[in-house]
Design a protein with these regions (language model features):
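Surface-exposed, short loops/turns at beta-strand junctions within beta-sandwich domains
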Residues: 81-85, 171-178
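Aromatic-rich carbohydrate-binding modules that target alpha-glucans
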Residues: 34-85, 91-119, 150-165
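C-terminal low-complexity, Ser/Thr- and acidic/Pro-rich disordered "stalk" regions positioned immediately N-terminal
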Residues: 834-838, 859-901
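Substrate-binding/active-site clefts of carbohydrate-active enzymes
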Residues: 209, 213, 223-403, 419-434, ...
Length: 929
């Protein structure tokens, strides 16, 4: 994912506020510890300041900890924090500021702060590197300093070096494709180490970069039905085209293995969400029609595979087949919302916004983008809630790890807080980019094209760029280029090829450096390209049957426009995306009519099949051409109907010519192109006179790359033809054939019926099972517990085979607690929290002393003296007392006696009077005697 800075050596640790010393050598019990992970969290800041301190949640923000200037303008401090997550900020010369060196942020209350994620440093850990054919894994002791108890299972066969605490694993014997090692182990004292995931590729895929990708986007339910047993019952209330149609993982896998994607040059698949989606239907945006969740964007489970698409095992098989074929797989992650039946909505209502409905009155899509709801049954996730954001991130990590995905597409990017994208990207980098394998994150930030003035499009580019960077997305769908060209140039023709050239070039200089953008001409969100390019019709934007939906085009124009558009799309920079069916010109109106079932070669007409063959051939050339995948873009020649441009690296060059005109066009080239020769199309290229004739309505490609075979003159590079059947759908498909010789044979026309000979209504003439088979009642043993990982919906009797996910891990699950445990799955009530400050008067001499107060708020009041002080300033100092007159002294004596009597109380006064009388009586008797 991180093409902006690719780490060579990665340690499995939580991201810290800044770089920290992770390795050092210590002595433990008299035995030298070769390597130990850092035992304190390091905060760092670089810059010119008089004083720098860090304040955070760990002590309730009460006191700051000063950073020490260890070198000019380099400040740091080590803090032994307990494992958990802490909001914090730096205070730099009395100014509170975020930590620019730490991309991970979060909200504590209503304020965004930097977030320190502190790992459990007492545990051991692993780190790893790959160089050439050697995988090197290092052991880092925990607090005890203990070494490993043995070799991890994932490294079975590796060589251990006791002196360096290092395993070395020879990769040379591994087959081509993707491998993922899950390294786990424990120390000799029994302490379990933090695990390490090591995804890497061998063979041709090892040097893949995402500029090499040709992405094929498919909606699983609408691709191919490979397993009719998982088809759901029809929903009568669903509008036409808005019900489930039976496509599944098995259908995708079958076409991976048949070479359907590889033959087109496709090396990356983007599948729509496969988490369990809502049952039934929901009201469409028009408020009239009912639609189902076949698309997957209404999730009702955070980690459940939708059984209507297949089983977890079938999804694993799909990914394994793709990797074996050198194809990456991208998930589609819905992070903005859930369906109202999702458990998060019921269990944690505080995790969701209570906004208006996007697009309704006083609810603008832009102004209210962060809190508005797409529909009233789609609660909007509030990423400012830390527990919500961490749960959503953990779910994405689970999907990627469980099914060994290679990245993902993030849905509705601009509708979530910025921290959603940043924090998600940081966590994916840490977990999966451990030995240099790039995980690609592609975003959907729907923007437009604001006119011919580049300045007018600054906001369009800027909004898309906002989410791309080193700790963010790797790229996004290029919506500006799409809106500038797809309809304006290719389907409508209102703009010419000079306009096309200009805006293609702008996509190379207006986005973040290093971004891998995804250009496209069609998608699952807009009407089909072929219908938009169909002249003389006005139904291309209709979406419901009663409006009248587009039919299959009956002229050449839509297919000619599609060839021009895809010839351009597959030869410009970026990771271009083909929407399933566009490769042969699938027709349709707006959603859901743009989501027809994919059709194979036997179901296409000649125009569609010819378009498919041409687009597949261009994709195959792109797959072989380094220049077309990784080269820069340079305009060579442009007129209203003709465009010639070069794609070139330091070592390779390809020339692309597009002519949408009705007549051939001749272009004179520079001498630098004399060594080029045709690799696609039928150009007339004279290398001596440097003239290139591009036939009318055609796409041509020339290249000087040695990967394309050349003849003795070097002027033509057509490889030797291999005749045969090139259609993968045919019975006699020949993968080695390069030219179709018309020999393809196909199965007879499908006859629907029950094909199962064991069924009561078996039809011997049927060739395609239509699901009508009926059977006598029979027990089907299997796991009937819906909570089990291997739940079998078809089972009728329990056979004791149920397996379950790992037991809950008790611990503190509240991220705000000081002892928060990120690995805990159930809260055991052990959470502890920093003391909460109670303001009040803490002076025991005050009249309003508060014994519960912990912080004095200056509210104390005190009793005054018995009268005003002589000068009224209440100081009571020595200088405020003046001498008293005798009468005043007697009065004071009397007052003193009264005060004395008053102080001893009624009983005391009686006793005192008794003593006085006794004394008087004694005196009288003494006198009398």
């Amino acid at each position: 994912m991180n093409r902006f800075t690719v780490p060579v050596f990665v340690l499995l640790i939580f991201a810290v506020a800044s770089a920290s010393p992770l390795l050092h050598t210590v002595e433990a019990d008299g035995t030298e510890v070769v390597r130990q992970r850092a035992q304190a969290h390091v905060f760092e800041w670089n810059g010119n300041a008089s004083n720098v301190s860090v304040h955070g949640e760990w002590d309730g923000w009460v006191a700051g900890t000063p950073l020490i200037e260890t070198a000019p303008e380099q400040w740091s401090v080590e803090m032994p924090l307990a494992p958990g997550m802490y909001c914090y900020k730096f205070v730099i010369d009395d100014v509170w500021t975020m930590d620019d060196g730490n991309p991970y942020t979060g909200y504590c209350g209503v304020t965004e702060n930097s977030v320190a994620r502190v790992a459990n440093a007492t545990l051991p850990m692993f780190s790893a590197t790959i160089a050439d054919d050697a995988l090197t894994v290092l052991w880092h002791a925990g607090a005890s300093g203990a070494g490993p108890s043995g070799t991890p299972v994932a490294l079975n066969g590796a060589t251990w070096d006791d002196a360096s605490w290092t395993w070395t694993y020879d990769l040379s014997g591994l087959p081509d494709g993707k491998h993922t090692f899950h390294v786990q182990g424990e120390a000799t004292d029994g302490t379990v180490a933090d695990d390490l995931l090591l995804p890497f590729w061998r063979g041709p895929g090892a040097d893949f970069v995402w500029d090499d990708a040709l992405i094929y986007m498919l909606m699983t339910d609408r691709f191919v039905n490979g397993n009719t047993s998982n088809d759901p019952a029809p929903l009568p209330e669903a509008a036409q085209g808005a019900d489930w149609m039976g496509g599944d993982f098995a259908g995708v896998t079958a076409h991976i293995e048949a070479g359907t994607f590889t033959d087109m040059g496709v090396n990356a698949l983007w599948l729509t969400p496969f988490n369990t989606a809502a049952n039934g239907t929901g009201l469409a945006a028009d408020g009239v029609h009912e639609v189902s969740a076949f698309h997957g964007y209404w999730p009702v489970e955070p980690r459940g595979v939708d059984p209507r698409l297949g089983t977890p095992e079938e999804l694993e098989a799909l990914v394994d087949a793709a990797h074996a074929a050198g194809i990456r797989v991208l998930g589609d992650f819905v992070v903005n919302h859930v369906h109202e039946d999702h458990p998060y909505h019921d269990d944690h209502p505080e995790w969701f916004n209570s906004g208006c409905i996007c697009g309704e009155a006083n609810c603008d899509w832009t102004e209210h983008r962060l809190e508005c709801l797409f529909r009233d049954y789609m609660p909007d996730v509030d990423w400012k809630q830390r527990n919500a954001s961490e749960a959503m991130i953990e779910d994405v990590l689970w999907w990627i790890e469980t099914f060994d995905l290679d990245g993902g597409r993030i849905d509705a990017v601009k509708h979530v807080d910025d921290l959603a994208i940043t924090n998600l990207a940081v966590r994916i980098n840490e977990r999966f980019e451990t030995v240099g394998t790039d995980m690609y994150l592609k975003g959907e930030t729907a923007m437009g094209w604001a006119g011919h003035d580049l300045a007018a499009n600054a906001n369009e580019y800027g909004t898309i760029n906002r989410y791309i960077g080193e700790h963010q997305l790797d790229g996004q769908a290029d919506f500006v280029l799409y809106h500038a060209t797809s309809d304006r140039v290719f389907t409508g023709g209102e703009e010419d090829y000079m306009h096309l050239d200009y805006w293609t070039a702008r996509s190379q200089d207006q986005y973040v450096d290093g971004a891998v953008m995804v250009p496209f001409v069609g998608s699952h969100d807009v009407s089909r390209f072929a219908s938009r390019a169909d002249p003389g019709t006005a139904d291309e934007w209709n979406q419901w049957a009663e409006q009248g939906l587009p039919g299959q085009p009956g002229t050449d124009e839509p297919y000619a426009a599609s060839l021009q558009a895809h010839g351009w799309l597959l030869t410009i920079p970026g990771a271009p995306m083909i929407y399933m069916g566009d490769e042969y010109g699938e027709y349709g109106g707006a959603d859901p009519d743009n989501r027809h079932m994919w059709r194979n070669a036997t179901e296409r007409n000649d125009r569609e099949q010819h378009l498919h063959e041409n687009i597949s051939a261009i994709g195959a050339v792109r797959a072989e051409s380094e220049a077309l995948r990784r080269g820069g873009y340079a305009s060579v020649h442009s007129t209203p109907d003709v465009l010639v441009y070069q794609r070139a690296t330091a070592d390779a060059s390809s020339l692309v010519g597009l002519n949408r005109g009705a007549t051939a066009s001749t272009v004179t080239l520079d001498a630098v192109y004399a060594d080029h020769a045709a690799v696609f199309g039928s150009p007339a290229f004279d290398a001596t006179n440097l003239t290139l004739e591009i036939p009318a309505g055609s796409v041509v490609i020339l290249s000087n790359e040695s990967v394309f075979a050349s003849n003795a003159t070097g002027n033509e590079t057509q490889p030797p033809d291999v005749p045969g059947c090139t259609d993968p759908a045919a019975d006699n498909h020949d993968p080695a054939a390069t030219v179709d010789d018309g020999s393809c044979t196909y199965p007879s026309v499908d006859v629907p019926g029950c094909t199962d000979a064991t069924a009561e209504n078996h039809d011997a003439a049927a060739t395609v099972d239509d699901g009508s088979c009926t059977y006598p009642p029979v027990d089907v043993p299997g796991c009937m517990d819906v909570n089990a990982t291997n739940y079998d919906g078809s089972a009728t009797s329990e056979d004791g085979s149920c397996t379950y996910p790992p037991a809950d891990v008790p611990g503190c699950t509240d991220a705000n607690a000081t002892n928060y445990n990120a690995n805990a799955t159930s809260d055991d009530g052990s959470c502890t929290y920093p003391p909460v400050d109670v303001p009040g008067c803490t002076d025991v001499n005050a009249t309003n002393y508060d014994a519960n107060a912990t912080v004095d708020d200056a509210s104390c009041t005190f009793p005054g003296p018995d009268g005003p002080t002589p000068d009224g300033n209440e100081t009571g100092g020595e200088d405020d007392v003046t001498p008293s007159e005798p009468s005043e002294r007697n009065e004071r004596d009397n007052n003193a006696m009264a005060d004395l009597l008053g102080s001893v109380g009624t009983l005391g006064s009686a006793l005192l009077l008794g003593l006085v009388l006794m004394g008087l009586s004694w005196a009288i008797r003494r006198t009398a005697s």
